A protein has these predicted regions:
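Periplasmic/cell-envelope proteins involved in peptidoglycan metabolism and beta-lactam response
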Residues: 1-294, 311, 320, 395-403, ...
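Residues at or immediately flanking beta-strands
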Residues: 148-150, 223, 252-254, 346, ...
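Extracytoplasmic
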Residues: 57-60, 67, 75-78, 119, ...
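Ligand-recognition elements built from short beta-strands and adjacent flexible loops
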Residues: 482, 519, 533, 562-738
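Beta-lactam-recognizing serine transpeptidase/beta-lactamase-like catalytic domain environment
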Residues: 73, 202-213, 261-326, 330-562
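Soluble non-cytosolic domains of exported or imported proteins
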Residues: 59, 87-94, 126-130, 176-180, ...
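Acidic/histidine-enriched alpha-helical segments
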Residues: 110-120, 156, 249-262, 348-352, ...
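Conserved SxxK-family serine transpeptidase/carboxypeptidase catalytic domain
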Residues: 124-140, 150-167, 171, 223, ...
């Protein structure tokens, strides 16, 4: 080949190689420019995501306190077990699945499946207690597992008092979201704001040094201070449960204790409460057994959900009912405010009235003859109040029905408040009006009713019922205090005072006397309403028995509504069924709240006395001291000096009661048996107690009633006690209605 040809070929090859290199480098430069300027941000994000992990840091849910700062709901530290599938190798996958399955009680195959996800973060189990967390840490250490399992601090809701106040408190779900009660209503306040932790990972999935960590702190939720008083609530729940059992109540009972002047709810209870620590478990044994006996399937699921909804439902806020004769306080206040009646306005009271062709009976066969307006309240005469309703007329009746807040929700800070059902003035017939006047046509919620009656006796003011007094931040500083300013005044202070005085008379000598408490100037009104919807649907007669009372009548502080839905015991009347629960609860609540007794001269004559201390005195001196105290001494033994006495010094004992004195040990072991003291007249009760060698202290209608019958005793029949022991016996007026 010629030399020139070789040189040309070499030059051409060199040029081609240079050109190819230039093109290659150009492409690289273009790619670098594109990566830097066009896709740089996207690729940077991908790189960060591949090397970092973001973990949510839970905020601690705020605490719920009672009015005295006792914690009713709080959050305890638990742990989340989190898998990091991207860092679980085939080598340790089976070891991890086996170990966690044994520790957590989760199916191994489920863990294996979860460990194969294309993810850096997969929650395996929440709410793991610290001892279980420690087991997992030991397992990781024993098997030298550095990545693939994370343990994150979390919080679990805890209710230290169990089922206490559960329909008010509510509960939270597995994700700590409020699902009922205060927990639901104030969920956004209690929840707080989650933080996050961003950490960098190396090639094997373990954390890189601290400088690669970024942390955004969580903000804990605010706390709530309730108006609920734990002591008041316990009194309420215990006595309500006793009343439900005693009266064989079919559809649960409920009660509300409220500050008359501020609307603060001191106690709110519904029988059959659930445990918010385990809210999905059915608390009613009968309901639970019914569900358990059903085969798995749609019907069982439906029954289970119905039972859960029932126990979670707050009847005092969500249910509506005919308030019965308690509503006469509203009709009466309206008529008195309008100047249509005074205490002494006379009414003719046959046993029925015929209205638009419909005969409407009073509760007393034969009627009352003639009653004044005040006597109409104290005798709970339907005939009187049909006439009072007609005096008002539909327009004025509805005007006050609306003014007392009965056409709209109260706005109480609890979820699920029900809506009242009522006739407006335009669609109310004369019959509707007449029957509504004594509480049997329109339907309201218990919280509406107690708020309305509070206005009757507190000077005429509609207050805002509420269960939260304050909101506190994480440091305990006050964020918000509930405004207790009344909404409006619906009747004058004069009308209010006069109505309170009539209602006090009613609790002393009228149909509400089963709620009477000596010294506390109680006022009250009973209610017995027929469940007309049940009658129409089933043909059965079912009733709601209620009692709404307050104290002290001369300066009302506390109001209480007791409500029993379908009582099937000895009576269904509000006075006999709900009155004793009111009296027993208020007798415990009022002294606790510092309400002072003021006795009338008549009450002073009937008061129990305190046993003087005669221990170490001679027999003669002891007898003399007891006689001066209007007590009867009874001596056991042959000694000359008193070595013990029953009742003990300072104990309450009825006037003319017996104090047993021991001069030696010969009689100290001579116990007596408490007899059955219920279902008797006062005279027969005294006789049975005397024959048994015990004393009785009487409460309830025995102090004011005309035909009282004993219905409870503080020490069960058959119990062995020392001679002279005092047994408290409660009395009711069984023929009282309302």
């Amino acid at each position: 080949m010629a030399k020139g040809t070789t040189i040309r070929m070499w030059r051409r090859t060199t040029f081609l190689l240079v050109a190819l290199n230039l093109i290659g480098f150009g492409a690289i430069i273009v790619s670098l420019i594109r990566l830097q300027l066009v896709d740089g941000e996207k690729l940077h994000t991908m790189a960060v995501e591949n090397q970092t992990q973001e973990t949510s840091l839970s905020a601690q849910r705020g605490t719920i306190y009672d009015v005295n700062m006792k914690p009713l709901a709080k959050s305890a530290t638990v742990w989340q077990v989190v898998l990091e599938p991207a860092f679980i190798t085939d080598k340790n996958r089976d070891v991890i699945a086996s170990g966690l399955s044994e520790i957590l009680g989760i199916d191994k195959d489920k863990i294996l499946e979860q460990s194969k996800k294309k993810s850096y973060y997969s929650v395996l189990k929440r709410g793991v207690e610290t001892d279980v967390k420690d087991e997992i840490l030991k397992f990781k250490s024993d098997h030298k597992i550095e990545s693939g399992i994370r343990l994150l601090e979390d919080y679990k809701r805890y209710y230290p008092y169990g089922a206490f106040a559960s329909t008010v408190l509510g509960f939270t779900g597995s994700d700590s979201q409020g699902l009922a009660g205060v927990e639901q209503k104030y969920d956004s306040v209690l929840t707080g704001v989650s933080g996050k932790l961003v950490t960098a990972k190396n090639a094997i999935g373990t954390d890189m040094p601290f400088q690669y960590e970024q942390k955004v702190e969580s903000k804990n939720g605010d706390s709530l201070v309730l108006t609920i008083d734990e002591v008041v609530q316990h009194f309420l729940e215990e006595n309500l449960a006793e009343g439900v059992q005693k009266n064989k109540v079919g559809e649960r009972g409920g009660a509300i204790v409220m500050n008359v002047k501020t609307g603060a709810i001191l106690g709110m209870a519904v029988s059959g409460a659930f445990d918010p620590n385990n809210p999905f478990a059915i608390s009613d044994p009968t309901e639970a057994a019914k569900v358990a006996s059903m085969p798995q399937g749609e019907e069982r699921t439906k029954e289970l959900r119905a039972a859960q909804d029932k126990q979670w439902r707050n009847k005092m806020v969500g249910d509506t009912y005919h308030p019965g004769s308690v509503f006469k306080t509203i009709t009466g206040s309206a008529a008195m405010e309008e100047g249509l009646v005074t205490e002494n306005t006379p009414f003719n009271c046959p046993d029925s009235l015929t209205i638009s062709g419909q005969v409407v009976h009073d509760w007393k066969h034969g009627g009352f003859g003639h009653l004044t307006f005040a006597q109409g309240i104290c005798n709970s005469s339907n005939v009187v109040f049909m006439q009072v309703g007609q005096k008002l007329g539909a327009d004025r009746f509805f005007k006050y029905f609306d003014a007392f807040g009965l056409t709209q929700k109260t706005g109480i800070d609890l979820p699920g408040e029900g809506r009242s059902q009522y006739y407006t003035a335009n669609n109310m017939s004369i019959l509707d009006l007449s029957v509504a006047a004594f509480g049997q046509t329109n339907s309201v919620t218990p919280i509406q009713m107690v708020t309305a009656v509070a206005a009757v006796v507190n000077g005429g003011y509609i207050v805002q019922p509420h269960v939260v007094a304050q909101i506190l931040d994480d440091s305990g500083n006050i964020v918000k205090t509930t405004d207790t300013t009344p909404k409006r005044q619906v009747i004058s202070n004069d009308t209010s005072k006069r109505m309170a005085a009539i209602l006090q008379q009613n609790a002393t000598t009228g149909t509400a006397k089963n709620g009477y408490l000596p010294g506390y100037r109680v006022g009250g009104k009973t209610g017995t309403s027929q469940k007309t919807e049940v009658k129409v649907k089933t043909g059965k007669d079912e009733y709601i028995a209620s009692y709404c009372g307050f104290a002290p009548a001369d300066d009302p502080q506390i109001i209480m509504l007791v409500y029993y839905d379908e009582p099937h015991g000895d009576s269904y009347y509000g006075s006999a069924v709900a009155g004793p629960t009111f009296a027993k609860t208020m007798e415990e609540i009022l002294p606790y709240l510092g309400v002072q007794r003021k006795y009338t001269p008549t009450e002073l004559e009937k008061l129990d006395t305190s046993t003087p201390d005669v221990i170490s005195k001679s027999v003669a001196d002891a007898k003399n001291a007891l006689t001066k105290s209007k007590l009867v001494p009874k001596v056991y033994g042959n000694g000359k000096t008193i070595i013990s006495q029953v009742p003990e010094p300072g104990k309450s004992i009825p006037q003319n009661g017996t104090v047993v004195l021991f001069t030696d040990d010969s009689g100290s072991s001579t116990d007596v048996t408490v007899p059955n003291l219920t279902g008797m007249t006062l005279a027969n009760t005294n006789k049975a107690a005397s024959n048994a060698g015990i004393n009785i202290s009487i409460t309830g209608a025995a102090l004011t009633g005309t035909n009282p019958i004993s219905n409870s005793q503080s020490i069960a029949a058959g119990t062995k006690v020392a001679p002279g022991t005092v047994v408290t016996v409660g009395f009711i007026e069984p023929d009282q209605v309302g």
